[in-house]
Structure formats: structure tokens, C-alpha cells
Design a protein with these regions (language model features):
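Short, extreme N-terminal segment that most often corresponds to the first beta-strand
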Residues: 1-26, 190-221
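Mixed-charge (acidic/basic) macromolecular-recognition segments
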Residues: 28-147, 151, 171-195, 207-274
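Elongated, non-catalytic scaffold/linker segments and compositionally distinctive motifs
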Residues: 150-158
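Short, surface-exposed polybasic-aromatic patches that bind anionic ligands, especially phosphate groups
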Residues: 164
Length: 274
């Protein structure tokens, strides 16, 4: 997926075409490119989406809207991992709930799987199976075998609780949108395999604070610095600990390599306060 981004206040600056998700090794370059256009702030939604190329059709609603680049990148990563069922659930629920803002769309990625979306009414057993999996968060094969899936589907369809959308008839099943993303601290999420995660927070926050910004190692200096700013780390003394972050990154990478050589699998640091 590609996004064409510009500066709404200064359209004469031109635009930049950004790949989404942003490849790790291109992150710093992308931020520099956006900086030449006077956009790409850590927190501000200052990137006007001129065009979305590829990706889910629902994302076209972001065109002509101002977004934050890191939020857009995070949303793209979340959606990139969706299968076709989750894609239908996300898009149908976005239409049903009328969600347009980036915070809402990100939060929707964490709960849209609870909805049931019917795109083909010809296979009642498949509908019944999908509905049971959606409302239960999964089902054992034995449970599915003991259930009349056709009757389950018919009850759902005859309930008339569905909402017709361009992506199918959606049943929300009582889904409630929760604020997993608070608008500042992007929730931890392993987009790629074999990554290390380090949570950073300001020294002024309590030990059990939920105000954590996650860094996925190895990452660029730009990602670390922007992560620190997103986490609210602005005190000069705290910024000096940037060297400690780099040292921790090296230590964690060595630990990962050691564990992999022993076949121990993935290693993750749950939280590290800066």
C-alpha cells in the first residue's frame, strides 16, 4: 500500500509517496522526506492524505484527511496481518460504527474479530461456523461437530440484527469498542517475526504506568528518538539516557542471537523504563 501525503497549509511544497507499512530500513529517510514538506510531527496529525493506493478499500475514506504518520504506519501494520475474514469484519464494522478517525480505526483492529460478517448466504454451515468462532473467540472442532451450524446460521439471519454494508451484512454481537490505544502510546504489537520489544516510559511515570511506548529492535535512531518523544521524554537528563537505550538494544540483540542458537525461540523484554 502507498500513501501520497502533503501539507494542507502549504500545498505548494508538493507531496511525498510513502510505502505502508514503512520498511524499517527506510523509516529515517521517510521522516526526512516528510520533514522537507513541513509535516511528519511525532504527535500532530499534520499529514494530509492526498491518495491511498492499494490496501483495503475502506482506507479510501482517509483521503483528504489529516493523519499522524506513525499512527498511519501502525494501522497499516495491523491491517497487513489480517486475513480476508478479518478484513471484512474490520471494514464492515467501520461502516456500521461510522468510525473515521485514526484512533478509532486502530482500536477497531483489536475487537472487530468479535463481529460476524456474511458475504455469501449460500453456505449456511460456513456462516454458522464463522458466527460461533466470532462470538467465542474460537471453537474446538468437537464443539463445532456437536452444533447444528445450519440452524445457528438461520437464527442469526432471521434475527434481523444485521446491518447491510458494502463489505457484507454485519452483526456486531454486542461488540464494544475499547480504548486499547489512548491516542499517544501505541499498543505493543509484533508485526514481524523474531523482533525484540522494549517498552520505554518517562522516569516521572509510576513503575506500573500504562504510558509505555514500544520500540522493536533492531530499529533506527529516528525510531528511538521519536519513541522517546511520543512517550513524553523531554527532560534533558532523560534524553542523555539515549546511550543507555542503544546499549540495551545491543545487549538484547546479543541475547536474541544466543537464544536462537540454542533453539530457545523468541525473547521479549516486557518493559524497560528510560
Amino acid at each position: 500500500m502507498m500513501a501520497v501525503l502533503g501539507n494542507a497549509k502549504h500545498p505548494e511544497y508538493g507531496s511525498a509517496t510513502v510505502p505502508l507499512p514503512i520498511p524499517n530500513d527506510e523509516y529515517g529517510h521517510v521522516m526526512e522526506l516528510l520533514g522537507t514538506l513541513g509535516i511528519g510531527d511525532v504527535m500532530e496529525r499534520d499529514c494530509k492524505v492526498e491518495e491511498i493506493r492499494g490496501g483495503l478499500p475502506i482506507l479510501k475514506r482517509l483521503e483528504k484527511v489529516a493523519v499522524n504518520i506513525d499512527e498511519l504506519d501502525y494501522l497499516a501494520k495491523r491491517l497487513d496481518s489480517f486475513d480476508y475474514i478479518e478484513a471484512a469484519q474490520f471494514q464492515a464494522m467501520a461502516v456500521k460504527t461510522g468510525i473515521f478517525d485514526m484512533k478509532g480505526l486502530i482500536n477497531l483492529t483489536f475487537c472487530c474479530q468479535q463481529a460476524t460478517v456474511i458475504t455469501d448466504f449460500s453456505d449456511l454451515e460456513a456462516i454458522g461456523r464463522h458466527h460461533l468462532v466470532s462470538i467465542n473467540g474460537g471453537c474446538l472442532s468437537s464443539e463445532l461437530a456437536d452444533t447444528d451450524l445450519r440452524m445457528t446460521a438461520l437464527k442469526l439471519i432471521l434475527s434481523k440484527d444485521g446491518t447491510v454494508t458494502p463489505y457484507g451484512v454485519v452483526y456486531d454481537n454486542g461488540l464494544k469498542l475499547e480504548a486499547v490505544y489512548d491516542g499517544r502510546h501505541l499498543p505493543g504489537y509484533h508485526y514481524e517475526q523474531d523482533m525484540l520489544a522494549v517498552g520505554i516510559s518517562s522516569q516521572t511515570d509510576s513503575e506500573n504506568s500504562s504510558k509505555i511506548t514500544w520500540l522493536y529492535l533492531p530499529c533506527s535512531q529516528a525510531q528511538v528518538e521519536r519513541g522517546m518523544m511520543r512517550s513524553g521524554i523531554s527532560d534533558p537528563e532523560e534524553k542523555e539516557t539515549f546511550d543507555d537505550v542503544k546499549a540495551r538494544r545491543i545487549a538484547l540483540e546479543l541475547a536474541q542471537a544466543r537464544l536462537e542458537s540454542c533453539g530457545a525461540g523468541e525473547y521479549e523484554t516486557q518493559r524497560g523504563a528510560v
